[in-house]
């Protein structure tokens, strides 16, 4: 293991156990939630890319009590179009463009797309810009992103959940 190679095996085991316990606790809460909202993750605006079934954001969405809007597509990354998003009508829209700084993402541009105002997410004011470093990079910080997402989707159910202490 990496912990053994760096001569910090005991510390690495504590971190791993805490990480896995966080996932287990979040998964348990998610299983108790009856109504799971759909989440559209926009990774890139033109052409539109979003994560599919075999992407970590499907699991992150699930442990946060949501459903990845494109979990039915057997790909890691799905190129789609705006008409498909309109048909699927997500409950939440999370904009996290790969390689683009948080402050440079412009939700106003999404709102100008045809029929955007008809989407559940827009009508319920559930369009959010999310941190790329918490959602678009496979790392231990994904659990931090999962906690943030869970508190947005189900604030009451996840109110006592915090990211692992090592983050």
Question: What residue spans do the PLM features occupy?
Answer:
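N-terminal ligand-binding lobe of clamshell/alpha-beta domains
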Residues: 1-167
